[in-house]
Regions:
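A structural signal for multi-pass alpha-helical bundles of membrane permease subunits
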Residues: 15-306
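Short, Lys/Arg-rich, polar N-terminal cytosolic tail immediately upstream
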Residues: 1-14
């Protein structure tokens, strides 16, 4: 018995060592890539640290107070909120529409699903942002077509060079990358039992009624998941605005996203990492508030099947 217990003890110790070995990369990654930088940024947010200066000192809440008096920061918040509030619902609506169409049992589903998912893979790339700038810029594809149709006066008109339309072009790019939420919607639609639709059809319910009375309530948890995911992602948008505006957020700060302004403060113009760190934590607070609102209101429109 004692020999068996001894062998079992050695075996358990070996298993524990193996478990620790496999867990080590994840723990080290969590510490090195997430927790330590997170803690460092919090500490830096209370300092006047600059990349161009070796020494720094603690200044308390001065960085946070300065944010309230920074007009460009408030402009970046305004631009980002417009982007999140307008582009995200439109993107989810397009994703849901395409998912519903693909769920009708059409042939070649795998092909169409792959085609519609491609924009999500490419949409945040530098190449697509450059292409977008060419399409909507002066003498680009869109101005050329609209000029020939007589909708605008000149081929030289630039949608990305006009403060009234520059943000809209980036919103269109965001909406175009609907593939990721579409795949999630499609997976949710395929989980809805067909017997509900059959029973509704027997009762005389049309397709539109079935959609609002069956599909939407049963799909509401998926809609909620996609909404939270896309809102968090939209708040952190950077690449498209950086490329299309040449890193300036123009014209007239009309595409000055919060992440873009944070980048210019910390890594390009002023190199004020202390202030940039404070801005990063403000962004965390804003995202938490919006996510909290989504969770708090979900009980009124998200339904879970018993």
């Amino acid at each position: 018995m004692e020999l068996r217990k001894l062998k079992r003890g050695k075996s358990e110790k070996t298993d524990n060592k193996v478990a620790y070995i496999f867990l080590a990369p994840w723990v080290l990654g969590l510490l090195g890539i997430t927790l330590i930088p997170l803690g460092a940024s919090l500490v830096l947010s209370f300092t006047n640290y600059r990349l161009t200066r070796r020494t720094f000192s603690f200044i308390g809440f001065d960085n946070y107070v300065e944010m309230f008096h920074d007009p460009r920061l408030w402009q970046s918040i305004k631009v980002t909120l417009e982007y999140v509030v307008i582009a995200t619902p439109f993107q989810l609506a397009v994703a849901l529409l395409i998912a519903v169409l693909l769920n009708q049992g059409m042939k070649g589903l795998a092909f169409y699903r792959s085609v519609f998912y491609l924009p999500s893979l490419m949409g945040s790339s530098v190449a697509i942002a450059l292409l977008w700038a060419q399409i909507f810029g002066a003498q680009g594809l869109i101005p050329t077509i609209f000029a020939k149709l007589g909708l605008i006066k000149s081929f030289d008109y630039s949608y990305i060079g006009d403060s009234r339309t520059a943000l809209i072009t980036i919103m269109i790019l965001h909406i175009w990358t609907f593939g990721s939420p579409m795949i999630i919607f499609l997976a949710g639609l395929r989980q809805i039992p067909t017997m509900y639709y059959e029973a509704a059809a027997v009762d005389g319910a049309g397709k539109w009624t079935q959609f609002w009375r069956i599909t939407m309530p049963l799909l509401s948890p998926i809609i909620f998941f996609n909404l939270v995911l896309q809102v968090i992602g939209a708040f952190q948008s950077f690449t498209q605005a950086y490329i299309i505006s040449n890193g300036r957020g123009g014209p007239v700060d009309s595409t000055l996203f919060y992440s873009l302004y944070l980048y210019t403060i910390g890594l390009t113009n002023r190199f004020e990492m202390g202030y940039a760190s404070a801005m990063a934590w403000l962004l965390v607070v804003i995202i938490v508030i919006f996510t909290g609102i989504a969770f708090a209101t979900s009980k009124y429109w998200v339904f879970y099947e018993d």
